[in-house]
Amino acid sequence: MMDKNAPRGTRTGFTTGACSAAAARAATLGLVTGQVPDRIECLLPNGDLVTFSVLDGAVNGDTAHAMVIKDAGDDPDCTDKAHLTADVTLRRDLPGQVLLTGGFGVGTVTMPGLGLTVGGPAINPVPRRNITANVQAAAGELLDEAGFEVCISVPQGVEMARKTLNARLGILGGISILGTTGIVKPYSTAAYRASVVQGVQVAGTLGHGVVVLTTGGRTEKFVMAEMPHLPEPAFVQMGDFLRYAMSAAVKAGLKQVVIGGMVGKLTKIAQGETITHAGRAEVDTGLLADIAAGLGAAPEVCEAIRQNETARYAGERMDALGLGTAFHTALAQRVIQTLQARYPDKFDLKVLVCDFDGRKIAEAP
């Protein structure tokens, strides 16, 4: 559980994905034992075991119900206090399987470009795997003779989704179930901004003259594998706070800055945004369409990229044309041009681009 006594501005929270996994695990355990527990230990995607409080536990024949309330810590977004609810049904016709569906308040994917099945629930891949793993852990030997259908719902999800960009992304009818680690760090707090600056300062004292800035845990793991010669303190998770990280790099006198990221955040940087939080700025798909046009993509492809709301869609369209590497390299070059204009003659810049599985797809220069 979270430390309620942590200093203000530093308390971490849990993602909608982690809370969904905890609710699903509790409900599954209810089917195994006949009673849903009021506390459940849940394995997070980052490997941590965390205990969650469980509410509304009930078992009715082959179906069990459980709910976990999201606590976002000191980074409360519009899904803070959401009731992540799991209804788990024993499926004797599906031995060994875990079937995941979305109920009321969980959005439905209606457009490509998100890495999710069109027509399916907006439950991202990492939470999907995490929910499945926790159900399997709770089910134990019962999986040998039956499967489990897990329906995740969020009673306040429709209302909460109005405060997100989901509708513009083609996710309709509710929120998305998100989270790559299970933990919500206080990215929007002054304390986290201070930790970014401090991290860059530490990198400056190492004597290597380089700092590697990443937008999150997956991209940090990716660039660490690409640059194994650097010590761990040279890598700083800047989150959405590019502005603070770059200013700290200038002040520290660092001679090289490496930025590792995925296409969405890098597009925002290329378009001149220095705070890249989803709520602060939208992806300029016109910029991506222009890059595609410069590489010879057909006008109808460029227009489709321009009209779509995600950078991922642009990358997938260009991949399909065999121009994915060239497209992502051009985007990385645009990031360098934008930052060199903002910080002229301050440091050498390198940009590494990874896909959503943490694999390298491009770099510049």
Curated annotation (Swiss-Prot):
Pathway recorded for this protein: Cofactor biosynthesis; adenosylcobalamin biosynthesis; cob(II)yrinate a,c-diamide from sirohydrochlorin (anaerobic route): step 6/10
Broad class of enzyme this protein falls into: transferase
Matching Gene3D superfamilies: CbiD-like (3.30.2110.10)
InterPro entries found in the cross-reference section: CbiD (IPR002748), CbiD_sf (IPR036074)
GO MF: cobalt-precorrin-5B C1-methyltransferase activity
Catalyses which reaction(s): Co-precorrin-5B + S-adenosyl-L-methionine = Co-precorrin-6A + S-adenosyl-L-homocysteine
Keyword annotations of the record: Cobalamin biosynthesis, Methyltransferase, S-adenosyl-L-methionine, Transferase
Recorded coiled-coil stretches: none
Signal peptide: none
Alphabetical GO biological process terms: anaerobic cobalamin biosynthetic process; methylation
E.C. number(s) listed in UniProt: 2.1.1.195
Pfam families documented for this protein: CbiD
NCBIfam families linked: cbiD, PRK00075.1-1
Family, as annotated: Belongs to the CbiD family.
Full protein name: Cobalt-precorrin-5B C(1)-methyltransferase
Native source species: Polaromonas naphthalenivorans (strain CJ2)
GN (gene name): cbiD
